[in-house]
């Protein structure tokens, strides 16, 4: 029987997915269970579930935040069991990256989608060279007997999806290390029940269309929607990169267009301040009420590029100014518009991220908005947003700017949940093993789920978050005999009063449709998006899926659902199929 325990309310997210592999097994030794990729959704013939993928970058994040990633075989995402944590360390595989790397145009010929003998397309654009991404690896199966708990911080970033679109617009596949599946799925809206206040969890599911041995279960968490007129006044500080690297139409030109859209949408009582940085930083505009909109727009229009890139100085000056104009009754945000490159002062992304941690704790949140491609630093932009208690978006077109600053303005500005994290507890009598797709750099120690001092994720009004698990059932389990396979716990802090709220919902097999065609269309959409990401990042678990079959599903969804976003996805998958 489905139950829900709600203590209090406020926030927004949406977790999609859980894959239940049928209890099969031709393993002769019933006492010994080995989870292999070909037992799962993606029908891979690659690594076994005994291989743990853990990146050095994950360890860095865990050390900074107290979080640990769940990437591994019979080990854990955290450690309800110290021995399992040791196993995780000892069994680290070689498919996790962890190092930030400068990525040239195209794919690596060895193992990339171009193939060993195929060069990148002839029209490969030099603008796509020298970008910095971090390979966080991918997660492997976790033995539910060793650790039935999967714990991670929520993440509403969408930058990875838009970065992918930019690469395909240039006629190239994105680098695998640039792909973060959760950010792909976050880029779409799903039809979840909306609570009047707080969060609500819902669960549904169905079989995978790509492997008849597996099932998908969606766990959706939706937060309250706040009308723009009901939000408090906003004090925004724009920190704008005006260095020489921004001297392109898709950089400073698009920054000007984007911030002008934002200013036009703000209320008269809101304020905007502008800090720019190149070799050093400077204040272009002191905090100014939107009533003086023309003055603000003129200041934006007058921006000119030149010089080196002292991101550290820009952030320090921006946060100082934001502190001086802090509104206790309102919204306080720094909006960083940059290509992420830093070559003067502090340049290490992790050091920069730690530098702003205290300001985030004081209630000044950071939104990082990436622009340009070619000499673009995705790592810095994403890490700053994580440590700045905000989110990371990438703007490649004016349409994307309108989505971020016009259509989703209140979500962009108003935080309704702080330090939000999820813990899924699987029943080891039912579930043999599970694998979380994505969130490789958002892991939290299992034992830290109820430690409210641990930094986790922030969500804006109406935001949704999506996660996907692949799950193998224990041999002999009859799905008709068991009502539940696990339980989802969601915990966050109300930013208004500081109260900590926790809700839970059981994963009920009766919520799972037996036929793919009977599942909700938005459930099918989330599945296609997540699988697309797995294919693009060369995850061995996706090797068994033909991208042409995925393109067929996307074509069908574009016809049935329609809308700009789904049509765009359909086109992107078609283009990726043509390049692979």
Show where each model-derived region lies:
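Membrane-embedded beta-barrel scaffold of Gram-negative outer-membrane proteins
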Residues: 425-427
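C-terminal motif of bacterial Sec signal peptides marking the signal peptidase cleavage site
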Residues: 19-22
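Bacterial N-terminal signal peptides that target proteins for export
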Residues: 2-10
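Ser/Thr-rich, Pro/Gly/Ala-heavy low-complexity intrinsically disordered linkers and tails
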Residues: 25-104, 108
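Exposed acidic/Ser/Thr-rich ligand/metal-binding surfaces
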Residues: 24-29, 199-419, 475-480, 570-580
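Acidic/polar low-complexity segments with low predicted structural confidence
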Residues: 130-215
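Long, acidic serine/threonine- and proline-rich intrinsically disordered regions
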Residues: 143-146, 158-165, 414, 418, ...
């Amino acid at each position: 029987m489905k139950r829900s325990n709600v203590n209090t309310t406020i926030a927004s997210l949406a977790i999609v997915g859980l894959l239940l592999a049928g209890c099969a097994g031709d393993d002769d030794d019933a006492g010994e269970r080995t989870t292999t990729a070909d037992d799962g959704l993606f029908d891979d013939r690659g690594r076994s579930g005994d291989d743990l993928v853990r990146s050095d970058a994950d360890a860095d994040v865990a050390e900074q935040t107290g979080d640990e990633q769940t990437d591994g075989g019979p080990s854990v995402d955290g450690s309800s069991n110290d021995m399992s944590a040791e196993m995780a360390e000892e069994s680290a595989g070689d498919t996790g990256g962890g190092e930030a790397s400068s990525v040239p145009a195209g794919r690596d010929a060895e193992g990339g989608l171009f193939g060993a003998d195929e060069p990148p397309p002839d029209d490969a654009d030099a603008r796509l060279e020298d970008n910095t991404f971090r390979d966080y690896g991918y997660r492997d199966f976790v033995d539910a007997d060793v650790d039935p708990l999967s714990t991670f911080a929520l993440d509403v970033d969408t930058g990875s999806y838009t970065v992918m679109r930019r690469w395909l617009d240039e006629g190239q596949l994105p680098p695998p290390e640039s792909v973060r599946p959760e950010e792909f799925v976050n880029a779409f809206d799903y039809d979840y029940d909306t609570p009047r206040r707080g969060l609500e969890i819902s669960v549904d599911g169905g079989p995978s269309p790509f492997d008849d041995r597996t099932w998908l279960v969606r766990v959706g968490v939706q937060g309250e929607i706040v009308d723009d007129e009901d939000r408090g006044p906003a004090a925004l500080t724009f920190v704008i990169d005006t260095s020489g690297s921004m001297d392109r139409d898709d950089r400073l030109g698009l920054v000007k267009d984007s911030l002008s859209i934002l200013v036009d949408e703000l209320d008269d009582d809101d304020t905007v301040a502008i800090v720019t940085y190149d070799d050093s930083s400077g204040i272009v505009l002191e905090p100014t009420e939107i009533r003086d909109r023309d003055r603000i727009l003129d200041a934006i229009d007058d921006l000119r590029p030149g010089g080196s890139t002292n991101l550290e100085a820009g952030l320090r000056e921006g946060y100082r100014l934001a502190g001086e104009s802090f509104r206790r009754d309102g919204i306080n945000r720094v909006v960083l518009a940059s290509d992420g490159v830093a070559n003067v002062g502090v340049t290490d992304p992790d050091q920069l991220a730690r530098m702003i941690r205290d300001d985030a704790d004081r209630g000044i949140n950071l939104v990082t908005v990436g622009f340009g491609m070619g000499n673009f630093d995705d790592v810095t932009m994403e890490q700053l947003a994580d440590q700045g208690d905000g989110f990371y978006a990438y703007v490649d077109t004016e349409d994307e700017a309108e989505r971020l600053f016009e259509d989703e303005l209140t979500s962009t500005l108003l935080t309704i949940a702080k330090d939000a994290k999820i813990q899924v507890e699987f029943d080891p009598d039912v579930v043999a093993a599970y694998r979380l797709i994505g969130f490789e750099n958002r892991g939290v120690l299992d034992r830290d789920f109820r430690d409210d001092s641990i930094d986790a994720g922030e969500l804006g009004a109406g935001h949704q978050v999506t996660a996907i698990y692949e799950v193998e059932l224990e041999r002999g389990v009859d799905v008709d005999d068991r009502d539940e396979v696990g339980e989802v716990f969601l915990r966050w802090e109300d930013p208004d009063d500081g109260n900590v709220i926790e809700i839970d919902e059981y994963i009920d097999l009766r919520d799972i449709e037996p036929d793919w065609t009977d599942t909700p269309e938005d459930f099918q959409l989330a599945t296609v998006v997540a699988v697309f990401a797995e294919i693009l990042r060369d995850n061995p678990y996706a090797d068994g899926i033909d991208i042409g079959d995925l393109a067929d599903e996307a074509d069908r969804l574009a016809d049935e659902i329609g809308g700009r976003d789904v049509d765009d996805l359909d086109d992107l998958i078609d283009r990726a199929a043509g390049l692979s």
